[in-house]
């Protein structure tokens, strides 16, 4: 029998809500839920609650939405909850040392990588971007550094050759809650030995940008193909076709014996099987894309109306009308 813990949960998006759901179903007591303030959303810009707040209210849990945790009032409010531990999952606010030290057992974080690899903001996307063959979820004890705390639990999962950030996000969102509950139970029973991270092996997962999604055809076809998967569903890779940015959703590498620099971005062929484009190394076959104002479509549907955009010899990435 695990000794039930008094838990504060802090998180904001769906990924966090799945972990909160697991805690609600556990034998532990949730004494407070922290989430980002409601934000304007949709065309009407009406205030929208986070997925975590909505779930907490469904279960009549007390919700707190401070703009910052750095004030004395925020610290006093949290301290009054008399929590044993605080669980932080994709919360979005910085936790100062006073907050980290407030719960009896400190604060735990669920991070979407096998630490110390991919510390930082975009671990799921960067694992695909780099061509990693596996990733996972690390439960760690938080300190003042950026994802530098001692590791308490690691669960691993493979990254498939067709993995997108959306599909990997779902895998880790399924993997994390069970890992979190196991960790909390073992911590409550004194069965965990924290493992320090090897800082020398660490690297950082910087945020994605729309600029980075603009395809650089001088890159290898393999890197571009990984970018397409890593940047799906956001910001989505794109290139200029017919004078407008066109999003690329699916493609695969076509090996070539040699690559010519003047073929970077050049359409080598186009038919119902795909548009083959020269790259810095090998070539890329585009099979699904999305012109402005349209839904994503198979290449055959695209060619029915826009074949003139990808005639052989055309250079993609240039503003050719």
Curated annotation (Swiss-Prot):
TM annotation in the entry: none
Residues reported to bind (6S)-5,6,7,8-tetrahydrofolate: 113-116
Function (record text): Attaches a formyl group to the free amino group of methionyl-tRNA(fMet). The formyl group appears to play a dual role in the initiator identity of N-formylmethionyl-tRNA by promoting its recognition by IF2 and preventing the misappropriation of this tRNA by the elongation apparatus.
This protein's name: Methionyl-tRNA formyltransferase
GO molecular function annotation: methionyl-tRNA formyltransferase activity
Species for this entry: Pseudoalteromonas translucida (strain TAC 125)
Keywords, ordered alphabetically: Protein biosynthesis, Transferase
Catalytic activity: L-methionyl-tRNA(fMet) + (6R)-10-formyltetrahydrofolate = N-formyl-L-methionyl-tRNA(fMet) + (6S)-5,6,7,8-tetrahydrofolate + H(+)
Enzyme class, spelled out: transferase
Record carries keyword Transferase: yes
Domain of life: Bacteria
GO cellular component, one term: cytosol
EC numbers on record: 2.1.2.9
Gene3D superfamilies per record: Formyl transferase, C-terminal domain (3.10.25.10), Formyl transferase, N-terminal domain (3.40.50.170)
Gene: fmt
InterPro entries referenced in this protein's UniProt entry, alphabetically: Fmt, Formyl_trans_C, Formyl_trans_C_sf, Formyl_transf_N, Formyl_transf_N_sf, Formyl_transferase-like_C_sf, GART_AS, Met-tRNA-FMT_C
Similarity comment: family membership: Belongs to the Fmt family.
